[in-house]
Amino acid sequence: NGYRIDYARTINGVPVTQTIANGGALEDMDSTMETWSYESLCFYVDKDGIESMTYSNPYTIGKIKTENLNLLSFSEVMKIYEKMMVVTNADNMQYENSRVYNIDRIVLGYARIYEPSTDAHTGILIPVWDFFGSMTSESEYNGETESNTIKTPNESFLTINAVDGSIIDRNLGY
């Protein structure tokens, strides 16, 4: 028994938001693209001290491409959230009777994005809004209603680019 401690890179006082997603997933199983998972620094600590440490996919920070970006207002971000939560979950309603999100934490931080079809080793850190909380779904199976609640503290249910409002898929990394 012990603890897992995750560390996040901070740039000018703003952290890269840690989520449960590792990034670098494939769009489909037939994809031949090379992928790139997120940077991860993790310590496992038990009663005797540090048991182990992993540092994966370290970033090399280059030059700042654009300074003093204009971010979307929070009200603009919330309008995008309200619309895109419906859009991104539309296909789930084929299998579920209902799905309810309880967002209890909204975080402004950085996320790394990249274009695996162009360059799987170079990305940029962009400001994003992440929406965390819980999700409860109900579905029917053999005539009985089943309810399932997911509450993972670092699972982002939606990531919105804070500059242009586009949606970032945390699993894919873009």
Where are these regions (language model features)?
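Long, terminal "pre-/pro-" and other extracytoplasmic accessory regions
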Residues: 1-174
